[in-house]
Amino acid sequence: MRTVIGRWLLALLAIAPAACETVPDYPNRPLTAGAANPPPSDLIGADPVAPLILIAFSGGGSRAAALGLGVLDELAAQTYPATGKPVSLIDRVKVVSSVSGGSVVAAWFGLVGPARLDELKSDFLARDNMATLEWDAADPVTLARLSLSSYTRIDALRDLLDRELFHGARFADLRRPGAPLVVMNATDMESGEVFAFTPQRFDDLCSDLDQLPLSVAVAASAAFPVALSPMSLRNYSYEECKGAIPGGGWISAELTLPLPRYINLEEYKRARYANALRNGKDAYRNEHYLHLLDNQGVQSLTEVLVSPHSPGRILDAVNSGRARRIVVIAVNARADADNGVGGNPAAPGLLKVVNTVIGAPIDSTTARTNASLQDLVDTLKSAGASTVRAPGQPLFAGLRVYNISVDFDQFLPEQHQLQIAVKNIGTSWSLSPTQLQEAVEAGRILLRQHPCFQRLLLDLNARPVLAEPATIRKSCPFEDDKIS
């Protein structure tokens, strides 16, 4: 039986004509000069103690999508009493940040909502998508397109996603009532910056996000270096808008005032990047075209939490007292399969090298960015214990941040067999029926048994919880526990 990476390599070799540089057919369209993309609707709601759930889905192909689906399934199964009727936790998911395989489940959830989540299995995850890519790559029509036109390897993945799952859906279709803000992420090859598919970022490009197919963002998010070519977008700010783009006041303030770069360097860097994309004054680089590759979605979730200019405006809600319970769920589909390299005295062959190039950076970067998110959440939790607010500073008093990680290393000893099984699922777009069932079940189990998820259920008076209340409070403590 061919290995997972052997299948990647077969597809690579089959579409080798695409290895040369091509001028792509850009999938994004311009805005009318002076126009802006519609901002996200209000995410917070009227009840400050209702949980505000933010999720980051990591990469890992279909393994990551199935794990994320399991997490959403568990949220859908849990309800808590509220005024009038029980509320499902999945209805409190307000922001989903994603990358690679995680973007498949993020985009699907944003598009169809909780009721049709399970269709992701039959429409995509249960299918041998690697075989489809192989057949598409070997098709004479595809080969002709690859060699004679701007069609590239990433377009083959985009077409697969659109044909099998999204069926022409665009970002405008995500703006349904009650839908979460979905932030799919990639990396800008020119600058190395995170490129998030948000209304603000597409304002920077003078480009219409509503008209962009969802398959473009998912494919860009999943563009593994080497295995897939980048997804390319055109920056219309240089011609159609000529630098005249609304909504840039915060950028000007960050770049011209002397203190912002010392107070919040990351926010200053974000402003600098946005200014460059907008063809603004004294831009540090000119990017007429963007070429996007795989990235890590946790970084954008961090920005949503701390940036006063992020699309979700979570910090504003905290500052105004409109959000007192924030739930951060970082779903890490990092694999840990033994590839046999360390036990073999011979130098690894081409298959092993390509496997490492594709898989290892995804897994290691996921671990690093999750650690950064952990530091941020710890800081917010500490601030939540404060009862004093300086003038102009966020009101953190009484804020509870439930920090929940879903990671294959968190299985209990009695769940060892399931742990080994899911850790050995390769990074590809195909799962066996057993692998699909195991990955979804892993997501449900790992979320359900996390101490801070149990603490959330306890604080919401939801049932059932898996341990005595005192044990749960001890496992996921808050500073105000000492007071109450």
Question: Model features per residue range: what roles?
Answer:
Residues I5, C20-S484:
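Catalytic domains of lipid- and phosphate-ester/thioester hydrolases
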Residues M1-L9:
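Bacterial N-terminal signal peptides that target proteins for export
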